[in-house]
């Protein structure tokens, strides 16, 4: 029986990878040849279950997912990411969501963020202002749609739109 389990598992793995959507990470905001996401910040740490605070990940706790390297502050966050990576990946390839509305790829301040509708939105904050505060003044859903549409034009990727379970009171954004 064990001899048959191995080939079946291998077939399942091949089948899953054949059906997985192919994405090009060439348009993503990634640092260096290691293709590091979010300047090395832990993507799970932004979400309530990871503490809700931007936290630098460790060089010793990393995951390479679909060509992108993520760092994690601890094994618990790494394991949460491995269970559902799409949930924790930043919107718009890790570029500033405000600028992406116009199709512009603008670098981010990893500490300027909003988690809303179960998605991580990152923003520019620097000499030219704080784009997160501009985003907050508008209609989040409309701005997210604009940025998602522009991201599709820039990257060819369809943005993930996942709403949290339960009522809208649970969808309260985490921000800093």
Residue ranges and their predicted role:
Residues 6-176:
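Charged, low-complexity intrinsically disordered segments
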Residues 1-4:
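C-terminal segment of classical bacterial N-terminal signal peptides
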């Amino acid at each position: 029986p064990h001899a048959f389990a191995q080939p079946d598992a291998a077939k399942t793995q091949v089948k899953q990878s054949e059906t997985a959507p192919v994405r090009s990470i060439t348009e993503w905001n990634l640092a260096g040849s290691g293709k590091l996401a979010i300047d090395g910040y832990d993507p799970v740490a932004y979400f309530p279950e990871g503490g809700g605070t931007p936290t630098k990940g460790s060089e010793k706790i990393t995951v390479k997912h679909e060509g992108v390297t993520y760092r994690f502050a601890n094994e618990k966050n790494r394991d949460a990411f491995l269970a559902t990576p799409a949930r924790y990946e930043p919107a718009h390839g890790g570029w500033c969501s405000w600028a992406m509305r116009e199709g512009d790829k603008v670098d981010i301040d990893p500490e300027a963020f909003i988690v809303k509708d179960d998605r991580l939105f990152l923003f520019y904050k620097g000499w030219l202002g704080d784009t997160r505060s501009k985003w907050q003044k508008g209609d989040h859903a409309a701005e997210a749609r604009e940025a998602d549409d522009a991201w599709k034009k820039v990257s060819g990727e369809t943005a993930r739109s996942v709403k949290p379970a339960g009522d809208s009171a649970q969808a309260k954004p985490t921000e800093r």
